[in-house]
Amino acid sequence: MGLPWYRVHTVVLNDPGRLIAVHLMHTALVAGWAGSMALYELAVFDPSDPVLNPMWRQGMFVMPFMARLGVTDSWGGWSITGESVSNPGLWSFEGVALTHIVLSGMLFLAAIWHWVYWDLELFRDPRTGEPALDLPKIFGIHLLLSSLLCFGFGAFHVTGLFGPGMWVSDGYGVTGKVLPVAPAWGPEGFNPFNPGGVASHHIAAGTVGILAGVFHLTVRPPQRLYRALRMGNIETVLSSSISAVFFSAFVTCGTMWYGSATTPIELFGPTRYQWDSGYFQQEIEKRVENAIADGAAPSEAWSRIPDKLAFYDYIGNNPAKGGLFRAGPMNKGDGVAEAWLGHPVFQDKEGRELSVRRMPAFFETFPVILVDKDGIIRADIPFRRAESKYSIEQVGVTASFYGGKLNGQVFNDAPSVKKYARKAQLGEVFEFDRTTLESDGVFRSSPRGWFTFGHANFALIFFFGHLWHGSRTIFRDVFAGIGAEVTEQVEFGAFQKLGDRSSKKQGAV
């Protein structure tokens, strides 16, 4: 037919067999990519330190999605929680990856079969003998099947009745593990950070969808509605499907970027708003204050802070710090975290306790300023020494460490104090290995940032696709150029293929 590249999908119009074939092939590609990507990530993933080198620091993309559904173990004998496992069986990273690849192969063969055997009796209207699809009935079938799956996921998989449950953690991402979840049927179920809402909403949505599917299978649409919504046109199906996809993409952008029960920070990394609001900093300070109030010494109180919690309170783990054109995992930026050095407390020669003002998310450089408890600037690292009044040397600042690798150490020399003041500007102080991965010192974003950026773009493109195909199906007669001066016209709805000589024609009246 000599179609241009952007019109090639015309070949599956009014060809139900090959329409099924291309959908089978598309699903095969998706399943094959998912399985192959999982195997690739497993090949490069280092499970040795789940606290300071978790999967989101290593740039893993599909593994966090597997883990949140309950896949945490590997045939290699490790678990993402740091434990040793034996015989994880099929419900493991490798097992799930291989089942997707096997599924992909079977779908590939099915696609070929349907491409070859495209002209089935099933696709012909018994009254006319012409190709026809009962699209409202097909909609009912799809709605019923997807709703059964939705209900089953909420009622069995998430609740643990027949399945592992889902990833559940505390509000600070320290104690996460896979647990069965009880449905939350009250107002608390609408809290996006409550995993109980995942179970209850899938059960509720599945129930409504099953009823709606049965309705669409048993009740025919009114003729006026059928014509008004162009229910007989396959491009209507395409347009409405695209709208469902772009809406889902927009929603997942929000749940990923702002955080939710389905995007736990242990699997995808912290959100930028947790850095902006000092979320982890406040929790750490509260825990330290409570420990000191219970009689613990400051060094002991800080030593009780989990390394995992301290690591979240570091700007390099903020997904907004990585530029969109800086490819690679976080570890290729600041390096592989090796140890928490501890919490530095600065003092001037008058005994005032100073803290370093932290860098805001969207700054690449920021002045190093030390303030007292009242927010008054007492020391800094000056840009011009000649005019400095508050330099580390002039003010006589010292740095004392509590907790971590440097617990109990005090630094009096200005170069060391400046070094740790610069590090404290970025949150809690960590030691990084930048040699192993040849890390360049430039921050990268986490999978949370990449997912959001990608899906926001997909959603925008699909939004325009929805408008395009929706307009084409509603105003098809206008776009086709039907008018009084047209002497010969293709009869729409019989055959729409460009260049198809078998299309029925009618003369001008």
Swiss-Prot record:
It holds the Pfam family PSII. It is a multi-pass membrane protein. The lineage of its organism: Eukaryota, Rhodophyta, Bangiophyceae, Bangiales, Bangiaceae. GO terms for cellular component: chloroplast thylakoid membrane; photosystem II. Belongs to the PsbB/PsbC family. PsbB subfamily. Disulfide bonds: none annotated. The chain crosses the membrane at residues 21-36, 101-115, 140-156, 203-218, 237-252, 457-472. PSII is composed of 1 copy each of membrane proteins PsbA, PsbB, PsbC, PsbD, PsbE, PsbF, PsbH, PsbI, PsbJ, PsbK, PsbL, PsbM, PsbT, PsbX, PsbY, PsbZ, Psb30/Ycf12, at least 3 peripheral proteins of the oxygen-evolving complex and a large number of cofactors. It forms dimeric complexes. One of the components of the core complex of photosystem II (PSII). It binds chlorophyll and helps catalyze the primary light-induced photochemical processes of PSII. PSII is a light-driven water:plastoquinone oxidoreductase, using light energy to abstract electrons from H(2)O, generating O(2) and a proton gradient subsequently used for ATP formation. Its main location: plastid. InterPro entries: PS_antenna-like (IPR000932), PS_II_antenna-like_sf (IPR036001), PSII_PsbB (IPR017486). Binds multiple chlorophylls. PSII binds additional chlorophylls, carotenoids and specific lipids. The gene is psbB. It comes from Pyropia yezoensis. GO terms for molecular function: chlorophyll binding; electron transporter, transferring electrons within the cyclic electron transport pathway of photosynthesis activity. Keywords: Chlorophyll, Chloroplast, Chromophore, Membrane, Photosynthesis, Photosystem II, Plastid, Thylakoid, Transmembrane, Transmembrane helix. This is Photosystem II CP47 reaction center protein. It comes from the Eukaryota. It is found in: Plastid, Chloroplast thylakoid membrane.
